[in-house]
């Protein structure tokens, strides 16, 4: 295992000053892309994801459409300037293609695609700053963008990450913990339905540690959900005030 440049955990405190069960600062804005049908920006600390939704609209070419449900397409992409490392190529990497598929499969259970036969819904996600947990921040942003677009949904999907750092379960991995920790578990969760839609286990986990991690992920997701719900509510309250002058 690679040695981290700084200790990841000392006396129960993480390198960035958080306790094991603390999220980084969560910031959420809705309606940030003016030409999209729905959009959202989600920041977990220094990780920021922007999602834009276009649709539902007619599928082209038509032979790819489905008669009884819509098709959702998801593209996850990291901006060339998003990391402190070398500028990445703008061409989608194998990792980005794989994460795009994972995010689509996590979002589909939340969306009532049967309401949109012969249609498509396109979801574009751009990571503009990366410091760990990019796929789960993307999941939250994409879910909010779908809701902002008025897409029929069973529930919002909230993404959080948990991991193992020096044998301790921690919430919301930053970049150092992501790179040097002993394991990570990205989680997608629908808080109202109490249903997991994404679990990707990496590393060796004992059963009791895995269950502890799941419980911590649920608590983190419920915390983020409240912020996400407030962001949606605030947007539409401000629209109502503009229309009705209240």
UniProtKB/Swiss-Prot annotation:
GO terms for biological process: gene expression; rRNA catabolic process. InterPro entries: ExoRNase_PH_dom1 (IPR001247), ExoRNase_PH_dom2 (IPR015847), ExoRNase_PH_dom2_sf (IPR036345), PNPase/RNase_PH_dom_sf (IPR027408), Ribosomal_Su5_D2-typ_SF (IPR020568), RNase_PH (IPR050080), Rrp41 (IPR011807). It is an enzyme of class 3 (hydrolase). Keywords: Cytoplasm, Exonuclease, Exosome, Hydrolase, Nuclease. GO terms for cellular component: cytoplasmic exosome (RNase complex). Its main location: cytoplasm. One of its GO terms (molecular function) is RNA binding. SUPFAM superfamilies: Ribonuclease PH domain 2-like, Ribosomal protein S5 domain 2-like. The keyword Cytoplasm applies. It is found in: Cytoplasm. Its EC number is 3.1.13.-. The keyword Cytoplasm applies. Belongs to the RNase PH family. Rrp41 subfamily. Catalytic component of the exosome, which is a complex involved in RNA degradation. Has 3'->5' exoribonuclease activity. Can also synthesize heteromeric RNA-tails. Component of the archaeal exosome complex. Forms a hexameric ring-like arrangement composed of 3 Rrp41-Rrp42 heterodimers. The hexameric ring associates with a trimer of Rrp4 and/or Csl4 subunits. This is Exosome complex component Rrp41. It comes from Pyrobaculum arsenaticum (strain DSM 13514 / JCM 11321 / PZ6).
